[in-house]
């Protein structure tokens, strides 16, 4: 079975350069998981072990999941694939015209529903936290977080729920003023979808 890293490389989802991340940090590496998730067979494979662990935790009573949600854009296909493997429904949150994460398109969350949030990449967890805020304000309980790539650094905010990454990959993250690539005069590109 191919590993998550092999799938990321095979799909050309691991990019090298100077990137401005959605978190506002700079990095020499970017994970464009859409390149992997566009292939249904690869999406299935990258989440197989994640879903296996989730199912084990559900079976032992450590986790309860009623619905799967992902923050747009990166979490839409990821959440759908995990939900498919769990035989659950998948919905997504997205930013409204004011840039506020919200539940739209007629999607509903019911009080006391147990929600698994799924993302493509977790760097700071900001999108996951924004998604969780929307859901908990509607009375849902966040039961866990899953992702393709966990690229958090040691100083990142800790994840407060059970966490199921397909792979943990260390990548350099810098604040803009400390960015080694900026100091070298290399222009940054912003491939993500969130407006900073």
Please state what every model-predicted region is:
Residues 1-58, 195-196:
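Active-site-facing substrate-recognition patch
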Residues 61-72:
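Short glycine-rich phosphate-binding loop at a beta-alpha junction
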Residues 1-7, 132-196:
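PRPP-dependent phosphoribosyltransferase catalytic core
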Residues 66, 113, 143:
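Conserved acidic residues
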Residues 123:
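Active-site-proximal mixed secondary-structure blocks
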Residues 73, 78-116, 126-129, 181:
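Short, glycine/charge-rich flexible loops or terminal/linker lids adjacent to PRPP-binding catalytic cores
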